[in-house]
Structure formats: C-alpha cells, structure tokens
Amino acid sequence: MSRRRHDFDHDQIVSISYEKDISINRLHYDKRELADSLSNAELDLIQGIQDFMLEKVSQSQWILEACPTSNIYIGRLNNYHEHPIFRWTPPNRENLNPGGSSNKFGIRTGAVRVCINTDDAGLMPTTLENEHRVIKQCAMIYESVSESDAHQWIETIRRTGVEVFRSNHLNWSNTV
C-alpha cells in the first residue's frame, strides 16, 4: 500500500489567517483547502506564551529591531497600527499594567527595548525619518496618546537605535 508524502501534495493549499469574529457560517470548506480554528482559550494561551517570551527578552536586555515598512511589504501585516511594536513597548505605559492590553495576564514587568530601522533601503521605499513619523502617527491615532507623549516615545526608540548603532559599529572603528 503506497502513501503519498506530504511534501509531494502540491495540490493542497494551506492558508493561515486570523479573523477576530469569524462565525462558522462564514467558513467554507473545499476538498483542496485545509481549515482550522482556534478557541478563545487557545488564543489566550498563545498570548500568555508571547508575554512570557517578551518578559524573557526584556529581562535579558535584548533589543528588538522593528522594520515597519518591511513588515507591511513582506509580512502578514496590513496596516502599520497592527505592528507588534505597540505591544512590545506600548506608547501608553498603562497598557503594561496587569490586565492591560499589553499585559493581559500580568506576566510582564516592563517594556521591551526596541529600535526602528528601514531594513533594505534598496528594496523598501522608506527612510528612517518616515518610519518614525508613521509609527508616531499610529501611536497618536490608534493608541490614543498625545503628540507630546508620542514624540517622547519615538525619541526613546530613536535614542535606543543610535545607542545600538554606536555600540555595534563605532566602538570597533575607533580602536583601529
């Protein structure tokens, strides 16, 4: 009895998508399409694991680099305001309080340090100044922070980026 190997099943379509309020009536099944769903409990588990990992990253003092335009072009984001930078280091610090939107289960003790970059300037139609501007605007519109608070938040992110650049690139060149 022969069995087809999964890596030869090219007629199978695997699609992963998320819709917040999908109803079973909206799902359609096609013999060639694989479908799955997650319960609210499973989504909570995933968010809890993500919060645990973000806390580990924060405690290890690692810095996450965000490339928003690149993530829009080649990632699964449709809009800048969906970028996880707003969860990693929320512009509204109250969101990190236990039960807040960035700390639903009270696992996290603080923000993750982040910097913003442009990724590959030859491929991505943006500048560092534009990345900061767009993310700042999203903070004001979607995270409901004042222009002053959004400016301070972006300035902290910008300083982190400069600090990382200097430590990675300038220290070794000054010793030559």
Go through each PLM region and give its residues.
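Short, structured coil/loop segments at alpha-helix boundaries
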Residues: 48-50, 67, 83, 121, ...
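Short acidic/histidine-rich active-site segments
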Residues: 66-69, 110-128
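Mid-to-C-terminal alpha-helical segments outside catalytic/metal-binding sites
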Residues: 51-60, 129-130, 134-176
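Histidine/acidic residue-rich metal-binding segments in metalloenzymes
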Residues: 1-63, 80-113, 139
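Histidine/acidic-residue-rich catalytic or RNA/ligand-binding cores of hydrolases
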Residues: 74-85, 124-137
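Hydrophobic alpha-helical scaffolding
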Residues: 39, 43, 78, 118-125, ...
